[in-house]
Amino acid sequence: MAASPKINRREHILQCLATMLETSPGQRITTAKLAAEVGVSEAALYRHFPSKARMFEGLIEFIEESLLSRINLIMDEEKDTMKRCQQLLQLLLVFAERNPGISRVLNGDALLGENERLRSRISQLFAKIETHLKQILREKSLREGKGFNLDEAVLANLLLAVAEGRIAQFVRSEFKLKPTKHFNEQWTFIQQQLLQS
């Protein structure tokens, strides 16, 4: 029972950090500002996280757990190649849209000037997502005996770039241009092009 308040305080700190990333676009978040937002001293912050980098790692862990667990569900439950790709990309866009502050972490904007390890970890997350897309596209040729005219790795990179671009627009517009806006129409076009290849 004694560990419960610590977990709640840690979660509260991470929620405040995400909120500050959303409400202060383009601004660097200092531990002093975060402590004031949380309503504790900087020393109290450091009792829960040894460094600001660890706070960002906490957000990145949340991102990884949220996205990768849902991607695994998509991989298990959906067998149609195009639906899998659409659902994976839509998951990424909806997640960013519902978590504007965290979309700055996904985009790398909030990590400028922070520890290189954080940017590397986000890069690794996107590499994992791209690997899932490659797997989905490769499985099409195994299941149907017919692949695409373009290498699956090139296609996976293109699909992920579309999602990353939408997230970048969302961050750049200070969260006004929703990443999911026009996605269904754009996906219909992309799907037609993929199926023709």
Swiss-Prot record:
Residues 7-67 form the HTH tetR-type domain. It comes from the Bacteria. It is found in: Cytoplasm, Nucleoid. Gene3D superfamilies: Tetracycline Repressor, domain 2. Residues 109-136 form a coiled coil. Its main location: cytoplasm. GO terms for cellular component: bacterial nucleoid; cytoplasm. It holds the Pfam family TetR_N. GO terms for biological process: cell division; negative regulation of division septum assembly. The keyword Cytoplasm applies. Keywords: Cell cycle, Cell division, Coiled coil, Cytoplasm, DNA-binding. PROSITE patterns: HTH_TETR_2 (PS50977). Residues 30-49 bind DNA. One of its GO terms (molecular function) is sequence-specific DNA binding. Required for nucleoid occlusion (NO) phenomenon, which prevents Z-ring formation and cell division over the nucleoid. Acts as a DNA-associated cell division inhibitor that binds simultaneously chromosomal DNA and FtsZ, and disrupts the assembly of FtsZ polymers. SlmA-DNA-binding sequences (SBS) are dispersed on non-Ter regions of the chromosome, preventing FtsZ polymerization at these regions. Belongs to the nucleoid occlusion factor SlmA family. Homodimer. Interacts with FtsZ. PANTHER family: ACREF/ENVCD OPERON REPRESSOR-RELATED, ACREF_ENVCD OPERON REPRESSOR-RELATED. This is Nucleoid occlusion factor SlmA. It comes from Shewanella halifaxensis (strain HAW-EB4).
